[in-house]
Amino acid sequence: CWEVQGQNCCKCEKCYRTMANIMAEGENPKRFNFPLFSEKNTGIQMRNYLYHKALDKEKVSDNWPFISKRVLENRDKLKELPYWDSFKWICKVNFADPYSFGVPLNYRLKHAKGIRGKLSQFKFYRKLHDMKCGISIND
């Protein structure tokens, strides 16, 4: 971990990425020195973290699409594991598009900045904005 010396913080991108790799192979990250791993919440926290990175146009590691591919390959085995429900979002996400993360609208509204940021969370507003800017809706 880059954030905490001598242990894993379980909250930085490197920890999330390593836990995701471990989870993608069907293992429990607690067995690999990630003491704060939660079968119920870690996948959701990971998704929200990456959503904010994408929203702020911050670069994340190029490994995420490979992790997603590995999850798809192991999906049948992973569906049996207790963390699958909080982790299955990774199969559908486009890591460059914050809106593909499937983050619930109420969470997006709570964390959006300003009225324009809140309005931009609604699909109809994005379509209106695209029409105003001359962007084709079918793109």
Question: How should these model regions be labeled?
Answer:
Residues 1-139:
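Nucleotide-activated chemistry modules centered on ATP-dependent adenylation/adenylyltransferase
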